[in-house]
Design a protein with these regions (language model features):
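Short glycine/proline- and charge-enriched loop/turn segments
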Residues: 146-155, 203, 293-296, 309
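Short beta-strand->alpha-helix junction loop in the catalytic core
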Residues: 192-194
């Protein structure tokens, strides 16, 4: 059991109907915690909340309260935080996607910067103990191809990256000025069940899985040699709960921490992993699943992304339980079982 989870606390999870948020809500309820969820359904899905309720007992489900609320609504968020009086906030709400931010930078700013500072300010007014918030590996920008270390940043390559970096700065300022404990988690390419495969801004793994399971063609932006540190959702849930529970003396407090696996997978390797596991589950030959088409690299994409997770290990006790292949195997089994 993670330290601090033996006593019941009240947790506010923003983006509760989203991919990561819904997994956090589920694990907190399974641990007997009181959870308040917030989402405006701009990208979150009501289906995810139904899945959470179906995964926990009625007794545990009664510990969950949900509010449809937009974090950009300053007064609304302030009132909700004041009313719920959470001990901890896990802030996952954001408008994700680099391409989306390039198409519509103002909406990304409103959700990721204005919405986040609304949450920070509501938290400090009520006296919330700690805010753990989702940042992104995109803040590293053009730093280079080596393992990314928290204190070395390059130039931001997209409005999305800029919004996440601004959020980190605000969190640290609120820590220094008001004493609000914050921990930022720089996620590296999170994947897992409940990740939406639909729409123009869908992440690569759910999009590819949905297409390949139907033996439809897929595309790689670039020549396939680009690499990412893909991190399974179970690892990310662990990181959030650890960040919420470590002592106030931890070096992670008022800082940012890389959350990945510390290993890279090229996009072509990812394709082969998916093809192999999909073929195994559906009972077909690997070569029956089409090879990907190659398309030009998208604006704002970086060629390589790898997390140095030594600070996460030292400051949080973080230890990834799932490798990329273990996560892919679990994900494919889960997703294709739904359509069997």
């Amino acid at each position: 059991m993670i330290t601090g989870m033996d006593a019941r606390r009240t947790w506010l999870v923003t983006g509760a109907a989203g991919f990561i948020g819904s997994h956090l809500v589920e694990q907190l309820l399974l641990a007997g915690q009181r959870v308040v969820g917030v989402d405006n359904f701009s990208t979150g899905l009501r289906e995810n909340l139904d899945l959470v309720r179906g995964a926990v007992s009625a007794e545990r489900g009664s510990l969950f309260s949900f509010f449809e609320q937009d974090i950009r609504d300053r007064d609304g968020i302030s009132e909700l935080v004041s009313r719920s009086k959470p001990d901890v906030i896990l802030h996952q709400a954001a408008l994700g996607s680099v391409p989306r931010s390039i198409e519509d930078p103002l909406s990304s700013h409103e959700s990721n910067v204005d919405g986040f500072i609304n949450m920070l300010d509501a938290a400090r007014k009520v006296g919330v103990q700690r805010v753990v918030y989702a940042s992104s590996s995109s803040v590293y920008g053009d730093i280079g191809d080596g393992a990314k270390v928290e204190d070395r940043l390059g130039a931001a390559l997209s409005p999305y990256a800029a919004t996440k970096r601004i959020g980190e700065i605000y969190a640290q300022v609120y820590g220094r000025t008001y004493g609000l404990e914050t921990v930022g988690l720089r996620y590296f390419n999170v994947f897992g069940p409940r990740q939406d495969p639909n729409g123009p801004y869908a992440a690569v793994i759910p999009r590819w899985l949905a297409a390949m399971a139907k033996k439809n063609p897929t595309a790689i932006y670039g020549d396939g040699s680009g690499s990412r540190d893909f991190c399974y959702i179970t690892n990310v849930v662990q990181a959030n709960l650890l960040a919420a529970s470590v002592p106030s003396s931890s070096a992670a407090i008022h800082s940012v921490v890389n959350i990945g696996c510390g290993a890279t997978t090229t996009l072509m390797q990812l394709q082969q992993l998916l093809r192999r596991h999909i073929a195994r589950v559906v009972g077909c030959q690997v070569d029956q699943i089409p090879e990907p088409a190659l398309e030009p690299i998208r604006q704002g994409d970086v060629p390589h992304s790898l997390a140095d997770i030594s600070f996460a290990r030292e400051s949080l006790g973080y230890n990834p339980t799932h490798s990329v292949e273990q996560g892919i195997a679990e994900l494919v089994q889960f997703e294709l079982a739904k359509t069997a």
